[in-house]
Structures are given as structure tokens and as C-alpha cells.
């Protein structure tokens, strides 16, 4: 399943990020991809050795960790270190699949269950640059407001179309979920959303408590910690 997570960064945060990224050191984006991806990748990424990068990636991690909808949809166990990319002058990233595992500074290795793109450019400021994701439900084309995030299964083939005008800047990362199976994770998310909706409409009652008990028992049954 694909999820739109709005408002991960405020407009003020986005403006500050963009101002700082104007001063960043950018390198060839192929430095962080495997052999297959390198053949179809043509973009730039912030140099991960820079002091600015260390500060910005920490801010992204803090923002997603504090976002309730992101947590409910992803049920994250491990987040990769966020990266930042830039597309301009017809740069693109052809169809590819993300690696199944990635190195992680704390855990050593992590499984990539979900991929996330946090948009940092106003969609009206550039042409092209759509994230195109192919999954079992068809093809999805994504171009979100700055500060919003899209979450999708890392098993999906995806690409970024050429940016023919302006500049597309984003942060991206991978998530190992507590729930490995996409279908089970989607069911838990739907159950959680409906519990929250019922609570806001009717307040606490025995039926809602019973549903909440069901949610946590399923999470206990399916989670890998």
C-alpha cells in the first residue's frame, strides 16, 4: 500500500531546509546505489561527509519520529539515515528496485520494508520529477506539496521522471517495520485509523477498548522486535 503523510515539515521548516541546502556540497547520486541502479540513475546527493548533512538528517529523523500518522502507517523498528537528492536539467532515475537490506550505523544491517520520500520543493516550481511506483494495484504517479511524505513498499519498481524545468529537492529513507508483511501492516493501520475515528466521535467506551485490545494483541502476535 502507498500512503500520503501530510505535514511532516511545516512551511517554515521547508524554507529553512531549502536555504541550508542551497549551501550544501552536492555529489554524484550514484555513490549510494548498487550496480543496477547506477545504470539508470542521474541525479545529485548531499555529501554525507559534510557537517550540514549531519544536522539536516537528524532534523528529518526527529520530524518523522514525532509524526503520529507516519508511525501508525509504518510501525517502524529501524529508520535508515535520511539522504537528500536533487534533480534538475533533465536529470532522472529510471525504473529500479531498492536493495533488500542496507547497512545501518547502529544495528549493522536493516531490512528495507518501506521506502519514503519527503518532498522539499513546491510542486509548481518544477516540471516532471514525478515519483512513479508500480505495484499490484497498478501505476501511481506522485508529486506532493513540500513538507509532505509518501510511504510505499520497497519491493515496488519505481522511478523519478526527468525534471525539465526548475529543481526538485527531496529527502529519502528506508524503514524496517515491526510488521514485515505489507498486508498485515495495512490491516493494523486501517484498524488503528478506525479506532481513533470512533474515539473522537464517541469518546472512550467498552467497545472501543475491546477494539484497542484486539489491535495490540495482533501487534503482539505479528511484530518482530
From Swiss-Prot:
<keyword id="KW-0479">Metal-binding</keyword>
<dbReference type="InterPro" id="IPR041097">
    <property type="entry name" value="PKHD_C"/>
</dbReference>
<dbReference type="GO" id="GO:0005506">
    <property type="term" value="F:iron ion binding"/>
</dbReference>
<keyword id="KW-0847">Vitamin C</keyword>
<keyword id="KW-0560">Oxidoreductase</keyword>
<dbReference type="InterPro" id="IPR023550">
    <property type="entry name" value="PKHD_hydroxylase"/>
</dbReference>
<dbReference type="GO" id="GO:0006879">
    <property type="term" value="P:intracellular iron ion homeostasis"/>
</dbReference>
<feature type="binding site">
    <location>
        <position position="96"/>
    </location>
    <ligand>
        <name>Fe cation</name>
    </ligand>
</feature>
<dbReference type="Pfam" id="PF13640">
    <property type="entry name" value="2OG-FeII_Oxy_3"/>
</dbReference>
<dbReference type="InterPro" id="IPR005123">
    <property type="entry name" value="Oxoglu/Fe-dep_dioxygenase_dom"/>
</dbReference>
<keyword id="KW-0223">Dioxygenase</keyword>
<keyword id="KW-0408">Iron</keyword>
<feature type="binding site">
    <location>
        <position position="98"/>
    </location>
    <ligand>
        <name>Fe cation</name>
    </ligand>
</feature>
<dbReference type="InterPro" id="IPR044862">
    <property type="entry name" value="Pro_4_hyd_alph_FE2OG_OXY"/>
</dbReference>
<feature type="binding site">
    <location>
        <position position="158"/>
    </location>
    <ligand>
        <name>Fe cation</name>
    </ligand>
</feature>
<feature type="domain" description="Fe2OG dioxygenase">
    <location>
        <begin position="78"/>
        <end position="177"/>
    </location>
</feature>
<dbReference type="GO" id="GO:0031418">
    <property type="term" value="F:L-ascorbic acid binding"/>
</dbReference>
<protein>
    <recommendedName>
        <fullName>PKHD-type hydroxylase YbiX</fullName>
        <ecNumber>1.14.11.-</ecNumber>
    </recommendedName>
</protein>
<dbReference type="InterPro" id="IPR006620">
    <property type="entry name" value="Pro_4_hyd_alph"/>
</dbReference>
<dbReference type="GO" id="GO:0006974">
    <property type="term" value="P:DNA damage response"/>
</dbReference>
<dbReference type="GO" id="GO:0016706">
    <property type="term" value="F:2-oxoglutarate-dependent dioxygenase activity"/>
</dbReference>
<feature type="binding site">
    <location>
        <position position="168"/>
    </location>
    <ligand>
        <name>2-oxoglutarate</name>
    </ligand>
</feature>
<dbReference type="Pfam" id="PF18331">
    <property type="entry name" value="PKHD_C"/>
</dbReference>
Amino acid at each position: 500500500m502507498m500512503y500520503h503523510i501530510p505535514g511532516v515539515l511545516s512551511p517554515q521548516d521547508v524554507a529553512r531546509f531549502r536555504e541550508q541546502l542551497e549551501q550544501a556540497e552536492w555529489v554524484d547520486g550514484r555513490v549510494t546505489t548498487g550496480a543496477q541502479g547506477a545504470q539508470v540513475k542521474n541525479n545529485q546527493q548531499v555529501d554525507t561527509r559534510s557537517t550540514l548533512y549531519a544536522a539536516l538528517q537528524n532534523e528529518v529523523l526527529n520530524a518523522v519520529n514525532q509524526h503520529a500518522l507516519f508511525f501508525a502507517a509504518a510501525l517502524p523498528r529501524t529508520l535508515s539515515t535520511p539522504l537528500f537528492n536533487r534533480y534538475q536539467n533533465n536529470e532522472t532515475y529510471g525504473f529500479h528496485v531498492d536493495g533488500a537490506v542496507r547497512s545501518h550505523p547502529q544495528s549493522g544491517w536493516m531490512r528495507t520494508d518501506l521506502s519514503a520520500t519527503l518532498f522539499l520543493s513546491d510542486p509548481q516550481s518544477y516540471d516532471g520529477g514525478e515519483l512513479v511506483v508500480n505495484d499490484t494495484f497498478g501505476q501511481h504517479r506522485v508529486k506532493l506539496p513540500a513538507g509532505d511524505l509518501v510511504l510505499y513498499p520497497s519491493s515496488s519498481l519505481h522511478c523519478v521522471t526527468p525534471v525539465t524545468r526548475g529543481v526538485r529537492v527531496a529527502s529519502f529513507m528506508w524503514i524496517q517495520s515491526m510488521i514485515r508483511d505489507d498486508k498485515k501492516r495495512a490491516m493494523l493501520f486501517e484498524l488503528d485509523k478506525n479506532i481513533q475515528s470512533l474515539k473522537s466521535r464517541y469518546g472512550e467506551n467498552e467497545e472501543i477498548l475491546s477494539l484497542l485490545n484486539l489491535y495490540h494483541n495482533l501487534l503482539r502476535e505479528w511484530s518482530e522486535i
